A protein has these predicted regions:
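N-terminal accessory segment at the very beginning of proteins
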Residues: 1-205
Length: 205
């Protein structure tokens, strides 16, 4: 089900909620949450985003959101999302089956620090807290997205890597800060689009 709420498109299903926020006439922000937890998700919505003009249509099979230079198609059966140029050329498509998953887990915080150990590593001396007392903190999620890349498409970005890889297609990349490795969760395609991930966590491509 698609609902226009202020200047966002709210997509509701039994699996979860997706809020689509137009940031410009060719860029959107997607916020995915479980069930009705969307209200607890904070986001900034600038005046520029509020000025973006868009329309949406809803039929038996699909929901379409149309901006001046971007069309988004949501398949009702699979909940997969596709992105198109105004001329109908496909930019990016999620796979039809289990396009995104969210697995909840319990996080913990340190209530009382234990003994401190200083250990020499390849990245220098690291400080580790041993035997700390942990208490439950927040309910967080392991998230996963599945895309169908196009033939001949090259993917670049995700930061500075020690492996010297330019085109990331067919390679596994771990995004974390260590030594000379600098993680930047921005993926750029040779087809002219980009994906910026904002999960405040480590990531595996």
């Amino acid at each position: 089900q698609g609902i226009r709420q202020e200047n966002t498109l709210l997509l509701l299903s039994q699996a979860g909620t997706i809020r689509v926020i137009p940031m410009s006439d060719c860029a959107v922000r997607m916020i995915c949450t479980r069930s009705d937890e969307q209200e607890n998700c904070k986001f900034d919505q600038s005046r520029k985003a509020c000025a973006v003009q868009w329309t949406f249509t809803d039929d038996d099979q699909s929901i379409f959101m149309r901006l001046a230079n971007l069309t988004i198609k949501i398949d009702k059966k699979s909940a997969s999302i596709s992105y198109y140029k105004p001329d109908g050329t496909c930019l990016l498509k999620e796979r039809d089956r289990d396009s995104r998953t969210m697995e909840s887990f319990q996080s913990y915080r340190v209530e009382q620090a234990g003994r401190i150990e200083h250990i020499q590593t390849a990245d220098g001396v690291k400080t580790f807290v041993k035997d700390a007392v942990r208490v439950p903190d927040k309910q967080l999620y392991h998230t996963r997205m599945h895309f169908e890349w196009q033939d001949g498409e090259a993917l670049y970005g995700l930061g500075q890597h020690e492996e010297g890889i330019l085109n990331l297609r067919g390679h596994c990349v771990y995004l974390h800060q260590a030594n000379r490795k600098i993680a930047i969760p921005l993926l750029v395609s040779s087809l002219g689009y980009g994906i910026l991930m904002n999960t405040a966590s480590t990531m595996i491509f």
